[in-house]
């Protein structure tokens, strides 16, 4: 008997931990399952063609909000052309409405609810030995037999997680090299957040700590790029997570570990670890969701804003750990103005990424039954909220566009320097939300939401926005970010980076020919040919006010002030940027004469030669 277990991942870089757990547990009971993964971006007929060539007797799919509709469509076609295949579905989208699913979709034969390792293995054994998987009842298995739906609707748990083997093999490492590897050290959550499926039970179970460390070492030995923990609250038990974090810091190699952490549970110990680990070793995701107390009470969530303000900034300031923070649009009592405050609160902490999500009325979540908040939501997965009692649809729509613009520019981290400068002024005075809302309105006025823009188009939009704001420093820093983030590959007149680099070379010629001067900035430099200069370096002029945001103190030797050009009203500096993204400032020559550059006298560059 051939058993295939599958899922439709949302992206190619994703992989399914659930399927690998099923396969690993099945081996302990002498059951063999073959894993086949697809993505929701693949043509459904291509998936159908592949599935039907596998000649499966039992076919299982893991179902989530991103794939349930496509999975059901696929299963209806599979059943039509291969009616003998027994189809079983599992996953969060099945676990809370299993009977309804079987009633509405005759193509589905069985469902497994909850944690499926034990239940699915018992199901396969029953089918293989010719017995009914629903009579006698297998906890967690509901099915259709003789036209009747019968069995268990219970969402089961695996009580002893130590019975579940490590899910990855040497063979997996050959196929998952460029994908995110998912992992867990615990199941469950101690909190009761009503928007989340994990808020139903308030219990946490742990995998043995020594085993977890051994498995993390295995990932490091295999040079896994990123291990993403799916623990709902990684730092809920110090006796468990502190030794794991210390191990990551001390032995994590080049592997990056992604952890979801609860800020109100953070102690100085966690802050110290996250502030002293190797840069890029650990990244954390902190779900604040809202800073509005009435909202937090309604969703049964505890936040301590004072605590958040005390533990998050030191981690960010240390610069070792990437900090990602979350907000949710559409929570009870959170109008647009209240959301603006929550946004500004989190923005003031300057996380590396501030993700804006939209409330989803998940099956099995408490918020799905909260009629008093007058939710209007999409009836199809992912059940996203369209309107609430205090947030009309027009505001939701605007916030959707806001999120898109903010994600493209601030969260992309391609423009760190310019947004570092902007953030500083917005935190001191003004509203970050209002600033990005103004940017969003210009985006919509130009119809960009309906266009497919390349990187140069998006940079040109930012440059125009900064220009309309009259912000020369932002324009200068944007050009700097473009050169460093894109290695000089994107140049466009629309944002002041000409593709014709002759003028750039002419402005800087005397600098490059004065080897002793250049060596103050570039060790072991010697002039060879202009082609090498053009290949390895780019130069831009910036206003004096931009220098502090490039880490260059004004008035220093490296950035000696020069007289303004005739066509410019502000003092300018020339910055060298090499292809590695390092910044090297130098004096731009201005006047002719046999001057000594070390004395900051200004000399002019002769006309550029044809060799440029």
Enumerate the language-model features and the residues they cover.
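Glycine-rich beta-alpha loop elements in corrinoid/cobalamin-binding modules
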Residues: 2, 18, 25, 34-157
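N-terminal [4Fe-4S]-dependent radical SAM core
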Residues: 1-3, 138, 142-185, 562, ...
């Amino acid at each position: 008997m051939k058993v295939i277990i599958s899922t439709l991942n949302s992206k190619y870089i994703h992989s399914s931990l659930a399927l690998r757990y099923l396969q690993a547990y099945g081996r302990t009971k002498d059951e063999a399952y073959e894993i086949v993964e697809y993505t929701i971006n693949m043509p459904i007929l291509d998936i159908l063609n592949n599935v039907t060539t596998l000649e499966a007797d039992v076919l299982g799919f893991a179902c989530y909000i991103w794939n349930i509709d496509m999975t059901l469509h696929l299963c209806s076609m599979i059943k039509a052309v291969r009616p003998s295949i027994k189809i079983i579905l599992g996953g969060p989208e099945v676990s809370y409405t299993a009977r309804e699913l079987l009633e509405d979709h005759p193509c589905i034969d069985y469902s497994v609810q909850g944690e499926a390792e034990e239940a699915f293995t018992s199901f396969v054994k029953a089918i293989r030995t010719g017995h009914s998987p629903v009579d006698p009842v297998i906890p967690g298995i509901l099915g259709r037999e003789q036209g009747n739906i019968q069995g268990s609707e219970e969402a089961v748990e695996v009580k002893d997680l130590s019975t579940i083997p490590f899910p990855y093999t040497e063979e997996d490492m050959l196929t998952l090299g460029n994908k995110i590897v998912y992992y867990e050290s615990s199941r469950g959550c101690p909190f009761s957040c009503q928007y989340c499926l994990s808020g139903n039970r308030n219990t946490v179970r742990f995998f043995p700590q020594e085993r977890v460390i051994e498995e993390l070492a295995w990932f490091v030995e295999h040079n896994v790029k990123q291990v993403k923990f799916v623990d709902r609250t990684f730092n809920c038990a110090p006796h468990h997570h502190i030794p794991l974090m210390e191990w990551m810091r001390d032995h994590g190699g080049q592997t990056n570990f992604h952890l979801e952490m609860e800020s109100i549970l953070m102690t100085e110990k966690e802050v110290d670890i996250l502030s002293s680990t190797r840069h890029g070793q650990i990244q954390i995701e902190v779900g604040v969701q809202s800073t509005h107390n009435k909202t937090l009470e309604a969703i049964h969530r505890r936040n301590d804003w004072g605590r958040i303000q005390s533990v998050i900034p030191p981690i960010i300031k240390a610069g070792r750990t990437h900090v990602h923070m979350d907000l949710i649009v559409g929570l009870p009592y959170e109008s647009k103005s209240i959301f603006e405050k929550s946004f500004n609160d989190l923005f003031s902490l300057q996380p590396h990424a501030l993700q804006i999500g939209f409330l989803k009325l998940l099956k099995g979540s408490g918020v799905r039954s909260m009629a008093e908040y007058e939710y209007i939501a999409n009836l199809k997965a992912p059940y996203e909220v369209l309107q609430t009692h205090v947030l009309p649809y027009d505001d939701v729509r605007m916030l959707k566009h806001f999120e898109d613009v903010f994600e493209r520019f601030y969260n992309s981290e391609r423009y760190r320097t310019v947004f570092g400068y902007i953030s500083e002024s917005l935190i001191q005075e003004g509203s970050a939300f209002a600033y990005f809302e103004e940017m969003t309105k210009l985006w919509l006025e130009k119809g960009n939401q309906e266009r497919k823009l390349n990187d140069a188009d998006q940079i040109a939009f930012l440059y125009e926005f900064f220009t309309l704001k009259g912000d020369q420093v932002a324009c200068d820093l944007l050009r700097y970010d473009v050169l460093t983030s894109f290695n000089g590959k994107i140049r466009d007149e629309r944002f002041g980076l000409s593709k014709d680099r002759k003028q750039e070379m002419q402005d800087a010629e005397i600098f490059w020919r004065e080897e002793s001067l250049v060596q103050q900035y570039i060790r072991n430099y010697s002039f060879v040919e202009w082609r090498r200069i053009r290949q390895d370096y780019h130069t831009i002029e910036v206003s004096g006010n931009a220098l502090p945001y490039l880490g260059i103190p004004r008035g220093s030797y490296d950035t000696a002030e020069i007289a303004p050009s005739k066509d410019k009203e502000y003092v300018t500096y020339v910055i060298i940027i090499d292809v590695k993204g390092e910044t090297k400032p130098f004096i731009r020559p201005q006047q002719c004469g046999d001057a000594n550059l070390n004395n900051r006298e200004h000399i002019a560059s002769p006309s550029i030669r044809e060799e440029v």
